[in-house]
Amino acid sequence: DLVRSRGLGDVYKRQTYSRVEKYESISDRMEIEIANYLTCVAEGRLSSEGKEEIRIMLRAVSEIESIADSCNNMARSIKRRNEFKSIFTDEQNHNVDQMLALTEKALHRMIEILKKSELVRDDVNPSYNIENEINNYRNQLKIHNVEDINNKKYQYQDGVYYMDIIGEAEKLGDYVLNVVQAVIEKKI
C-alpha cells in the first residue's frame, strides 16, 4: 500500500511509516536483549558444541534484526519517494509487487524452517532457489531501468527511487537466507 501512493492519504502513509519505524526499534532492543542473554550463557560452563550453538543463535538473531533494518530502509525509501512526489509507472508498480511477492515467499519459507523441529541439509534448497529468483529478477530490473530511463519512460530520479526499493528488497532476501542457513546449521 505504501508503494502505491496515488490514492493513499498523507496521514495513512505517515502512520504506516511510523509503525515500521516502531517495530524496527523494538527489533533493535530485542536483538540486544537476546544477544546479552546468550553472551551470559556462553560465559558459563559450556561444551564446545554448546558454545557453537550459541554462536549460531547469535548469528540468527543478528540476521533477523537485519531483516527489520531492511524493512525500515525500504519504508524510508518509499517515504522519500512520496515526499518528492515521484509516481511510479504501472510497470514499475507491477515489478515492485513481483519483487515483494518473492521476498514474501522467502519469508514464508524461513518461517517454515523455524517451525520445523527436525531438518536435513536439503531443506535449505528451496530458500536458495527463491534467493536466486530474487537476485535474477533484481538484475533484470536493473537492466530494464536503464533502458526505460534512456527511452524516457520516466525520469532518472524516479528510477533511483525505484531501484532503491528493489535493491533493499534483494538485501532483505539475503538476510532471510542467512537466517535459514543459521537455523539449518543449528538443527542438523
Regions from the PLM with identified roles:
Residues 5-188:
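Cytosolic, long alpha-helical scaffolding segments
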